[in-house]
């Protein structure tokens, strides 16, 4: 449009000599059309347009006859003012289509940006990995007979192959079809969404929940909404927060304070800079996925209460994995109390009910897809009413939501998958450390192996895949800082001692073949990320030996097929 305007201003005497105000005034009535008829080009175009109107007026449909076509061939039916497009384009005096200005070089820009990523070795290649449900944790590559063992999936508990989940998805898929049919506001609000949100609220022992298409969307939508709606809000963000949280904070346009990772002193120093009346929100994760560290949730809640801040806790890498029922690290911190009370809330205050908001995913430990947030009923209703990321997107398919509910119910009633996963994780960590492989120390289920160079990390990943049929993804910038590149290993209940020994032996060989730095080498360099650093105290796993000794007989029977009352918040709250 701007290009047409510029051309018109340069070639049309009428437009050139008229002010913008005059043109706007003329456009409000027929005067502009009258003036346009005096133009040799616009006049012809207007006459041609009007001459065709009789052919598009409302008439009864009739069948064309050969005689009518013969008496009125197409060429004679055209207006005498009609003209061919190529005639107008070819008239150099009419419109000059060649701009004298240089256009932006989009192609050059894109190629330059991609070239930079290739140069710094952060350009990403996606491996074709097709996980096999009946052979978990196996997968095949592009050819079905080319099978590998997957060691880096986020399907932490193997729920992607769980019969309860799959059967429920099949049942609902057959009855309700493949899609939801609309947004939650228009034809996409259904019993499956209500059931899933009720399950999630009960899991986290919060008043209500809201399901999003992914947790990236949930984090972005919620955090951006806070900043856009609450004047003078300050968001305090851990420096290792996930990209979805960073994006949400950026989109919020709120003032932000980034505090050092898990550093309570730094967080308090920043909180203390603002009056208690200033609205504040602390955004952090429970398990940080690339290093495996765990946040001091209880202490952060203490600071939030002291300085009048809301707490926003991302439990994406913890739901399903921690706590007696899989509600995450916040539940795990009061393990015995929640184990005893089951589906009910403990009589005493817990960390879980001190956290204002919890976001989580259905796409990792629960084996499906989607994200969610839980919290107070009025908070959830506010998100439902104002968050564009929720309002203007199609609802998850009914089968996905039903399968997710089945996964939550299953994991709530068993400890065995979590215990098996933690047991296998300890086995891998201990044996890798024993042979000097630099595992970044942490208390969680993540096994990050430090490489420290993007090219070497890619070579190690490729060698494991091509030579040993083991798939471990290399992690590089911007997911981790430059110089801290690593291999990220995530054992599951299916990675028992036999597969674990294969991985340990393969990594040992790869480190030798590529001359990668081991723990002793990192010690000589002064250490990095907790590997080879002096005065590093041993880190205890969050799952204790006593907890790993529990069985399903220790679970409160009230969690097995409990009657969970539907929560109607996402339908709208009646006055």
From Swiss-Prot:
Annotated binding of pyridoxal 5'-phosphate, by residue: 289, 317, 361, 393-394
Parts forming coiled coils: none
Lineage, uppermost ranks: Eukaryota, Fungi, Dikarya, Ascomycota, Saccharomycotina
Compartment(s) where it occurs, according to its Swiss-Prot or TrEMBL record: Mitochondrion matrix
GO cellular-component term (any): mitochondrial matrix
Name this polypeptide is given: 5-aminolevulinate synthase, mitochondrial
Catalytic activity: succinyl-CoA + glycine + H(+) = 5-aminolevulinate + CO2 + CoA
One of the protein's GO biological processes: positive regulation of organelle assembly
């Amino acid at each position: 449009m701007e290009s047409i305007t510029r051309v018109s201003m340069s070639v049309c005497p009428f437009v050139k000599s008229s002010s913008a105000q005059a043109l706007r005034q003329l456009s409000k009535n027929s005067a502009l059309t009258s003036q346009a008829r005096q133009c040799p080009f616009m006049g012809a175009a207007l006459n041609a347009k009007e001459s065709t109107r009789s052919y598009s007026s409302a008439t009864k449909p009739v069948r064309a006859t050969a005689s009518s076509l013969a008496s009125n061939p197409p060429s004679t039916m055209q207006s005498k003012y009609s003209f061919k497009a190529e005639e107008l384009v070819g008239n150099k005096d009419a419109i000059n289509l060649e701009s004298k200005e240089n256009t932006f070089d989009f192609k050059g820009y894109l190629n330059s940006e991609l070239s930079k990523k290739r140069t710094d070795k952060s350009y990403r290649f996606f491996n074709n990995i097709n996980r096999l449900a009946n052979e978990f944790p196996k997968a095949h590559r592009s050819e079905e007979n080319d099978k590998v063992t997957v060691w880096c999936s986020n399907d932490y508990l193997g729920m992607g192959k769980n019969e309860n989940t799959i059967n429920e998805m099949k049942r609902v898929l057959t009855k309700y079809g493949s899609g939801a049919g609309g947004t939650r506001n228009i034809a996409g609000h259904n019993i499956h969404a209500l059931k899933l949100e009720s399950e999630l609220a009960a899991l986290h022992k919060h008043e209500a929940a809201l399901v999003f298409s992914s947790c990236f969307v949930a984090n972005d939508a919620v955090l951006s909404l806070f900043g856009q709606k609450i004047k003078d809000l300050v968001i305090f963000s851990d420096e290792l927060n996930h990209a979805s949280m960073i994006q949400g904070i950026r989109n919020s346009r709120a003032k932000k304070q980034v505090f050092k990772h898990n550093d309570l002193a730094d967080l308090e120093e920043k909180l203390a800079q603002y009056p208690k009346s200033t609205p504040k929100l602390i955004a952090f994760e429970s398990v940080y996925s690339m290093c495996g560290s765990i946040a001091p949730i209880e202490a952060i809640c203490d600071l939030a209460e002291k300085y009048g801040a809301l707490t926003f806790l991302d439990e994406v890498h913890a739901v399903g994995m921690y706590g007696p029922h899989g509600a995450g690290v916040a539940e795990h911190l009061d393990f015995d109390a929640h184990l005893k009370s089951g589906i009910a809330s403990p009589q005493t205050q817990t960390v879980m009910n001190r956290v204002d908001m919890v976001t989580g995913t259905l796409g990792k430990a629960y084996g499906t897809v989607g994200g969610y947030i839980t919290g107070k009923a009025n908070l959830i209703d506010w998100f439902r009413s104002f968050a564009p990321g929720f309002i203007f997107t199609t609802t998850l398919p009914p089968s996905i939501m039903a399968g997710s509910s089945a996964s939550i119910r299953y994991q709530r009633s068993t400890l065995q998958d979590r215990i098996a996963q933690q047991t296998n994780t300890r086995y891998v960590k201990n044996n890798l450390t024993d042979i000097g492989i630099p595992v970044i120390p942490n208390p969680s289920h993540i096994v990050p192996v430090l490489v420290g160079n993007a090219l070497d990390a890619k070579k190690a990943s490729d060698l494991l895949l091509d030579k040993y049929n083991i798939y471990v993804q290399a992690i590089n910038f911007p997911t981790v800082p430059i110089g801290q590149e690593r291999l990220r290993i995530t054992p599951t209940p299916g990675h028992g001692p036999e597969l674990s020994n294969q991985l340990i032996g393969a990594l040992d060989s790869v480190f030798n073949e590529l001359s990668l730095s081991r723990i002793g080498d990192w010690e000589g360099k002064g250490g990095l990320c907790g590997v080879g650093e002096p005065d590093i105290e041993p880190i205890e796993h969050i799952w204790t030996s006593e907890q790993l000794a529990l069985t399903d007989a220790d679970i409160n029977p009230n969690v097995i097929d409990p009657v969970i009352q539907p929560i109607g918040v996402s339908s709208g709250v009646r006055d």
